[in-house]
Amino acid sequence: MTNLPKFSTALLHPRYWLTWLGIGVLWLVVQLPYPVIYRLGCGLGKLALRFMKRRAKIVHRNLELCFPEMSEQERRKMVVKNFESVGMGLMETGMAWFWPDRRIARWTEVIGMEHIRDVQAQKRGILLVGIHFLTLELGARQFGMQEPGIGVYRPNDNPLIDWLQTWGRLRSNKSMLDRKDLKGMIKALKKGEVVWYAPDHDYGPRSSVFVPLFAVEQAATTTGTWMLARMSGACLVPFVPRRKPDGKGYQLIMLPPECSPPLDDAETTAAWMNKVVEKCIMMAPEQYMWLHRRFKTRPEGVPSRY
C-alpha cells in the first residue's frame, strides 16, 4: 500500500496555525444539529457564488455544453443550487472527518447493499465507481461503514490537510492508494477487495481517449477503467451518495453491478463508462462537481471550450 502521511510535531509549526484555526472552526460548526448545518452550508454556498465568479462561469459553461436544451433561466437556477451544494460539501467534509459512526448512520439511508454482497459471494473484486459529487467525502465514509474498502486519492500539497484527510478517510476504510498506483489497485482487486475509483474527471491527454459525454462529442476520458477491469477481472459497482432535499439526510445508493463490461478496446470501454457516469449524475445533477473544467483537454489544434 501507499506510504500514508502520519502526524508529526512539524505540523504544529506556526506556518500551519491558520490551517489549524480553519480545522477548529469546521469541527465546531459540525457539532451543531444537522438541520442547522444544512442551512449554514447552503448559505455559505450562496455567499461563495458572489465571490467565485470564475468558478461560476465554469459551472455555467459545463451546463451549457452538457445540456444545450436547458433554458438560460434553468441554467442560472442550477448554478445557484450547485453552489449551495458546494457550501454543503465543505460541511459534509467536516461531518465525514469528525462525526461518530452513530450520527452518520442516523442520517443515512442505504440502498442496494445487496449488490455488493452478491459480487462478494462470487469471490471477485469490486471496482466501486464513485462519481465526483460534492457529497463525495461523506459518501466514502458512509460506504466504509457498510463495507471497509480501499480509497484512491491525490496527495494534498498542504502536509497538514494531507494527513487530516487521510486520517478522516481511514476512520471507516482499510487503506489508501495514490491514484497513479494502477499496480496497487489491480493487486487489491485480485485479492477481492473493494477499490474506490472515479473515472469522470478530465485527467489530461495522457492515457485518455475522446468519447461522448452528454452533448459533448469529444470528452477526454480516462482509459483506466479499461485497464483495471481487463487486468483484474473485477465487477464494477457504481454508487451515488445523494443528499436529500431540505436537510432530511442522505441516500447511499449502490447500482446493479456490471461484471462483463465491454472491453474490446479502450474507446469502447470509455464510451460505455461515460453512459454510466451520465446515469449517476442525473440522479442528483445539482450536487455534481460542475466547478471542474471537465472538457479542458481538447484534440490537438482544437480551440479551448473555456
Swiss-Prot record:
GO terms for cellular component: membrane; plasma membrane. It catalyses: dodecanoyl-[ACP] + alpha-Kdo-(2->4)-alpha-Kdo-(2->6)-lipid IVA (E. coli) = alpha-Kdo-(2->4)-alpha-Kdo-(2->6)-(dodecanoyl)-lipid IVA (E. coli) + holo-[ACP]. Changing residue 238 to A: Slight decrease in activity. Changing residue 137 to A: Almost loss of activity. Changing residue 169 to A: 169-fold decrease in activity. Induction: Is expressed at all temperatures, but accumulation of htrB transcripts slightly declines with raising temperature. Thus, its expression is not induced by heat shock. It holds the Pfam family Lip_A_acyltrans. Belongs to the LpxL/LpxM/LpxP family. Monomer. This is Lipid A biosynthesis lauroyltransferase. It comes from Escherichia coli (strain K12).
